[in-house]
Amino acid sequence: MRVHITLECTECHERNYLSSKNRRNNPDRVEFKKYCPRDRKVTLHRETK
């Protein structure tokens, strides 16, 4: 079952991206390196509740 998640920047704590994940394959919180428009650089984005 795929669920919608929000990705938050670890540096500025802005919620920049919406995504989906499969809970069966990824039960833990996912992390991606994505572009943060506020910092104007690529930063680590983590899943929020």
Curated annotation (Swiss-Prot):
Gene Ontology cellular-component annotations: cytoplasm; ribonucleoprotein complex; ribosome
Q: Does the keyword Ribonucleoprotein apply?
A: yes
Annotated transmembrane regions: none
InterPro entries, per the entry: Ribosomal_bL33 (IPR001705), Ribosomal_bL33_CS (IPR018264), Ribosomal_bL33_sf (IPR038584), Ribosomal_zn-bd (IPR011332)
The entry lists its GO molecular-function terms as: structural constituent of ribosome
User: What SUPFAM superfamilies does this protein's entry cite?
Assistant: Zn-binding ribosomal proteins
GO BP field = translation
Q: Which UniProt keywords apply?
A: Ribonucleoprotein, Ribosomal protein
Gene3D superfamilies registered for this protein in UniProt:
Ribosomal protein L33 (2.20.28.120)
What family is reported?
Answer: Belongs to the bacterial ribosomal protein bL33 family.
Question: Which NCBIfam families does the entry mention?
Answer: PRK00504.1, PRK00595.1, rpmG_bact
Q: What is this protein called?
A: Large ribosomal subunit protein bL33B
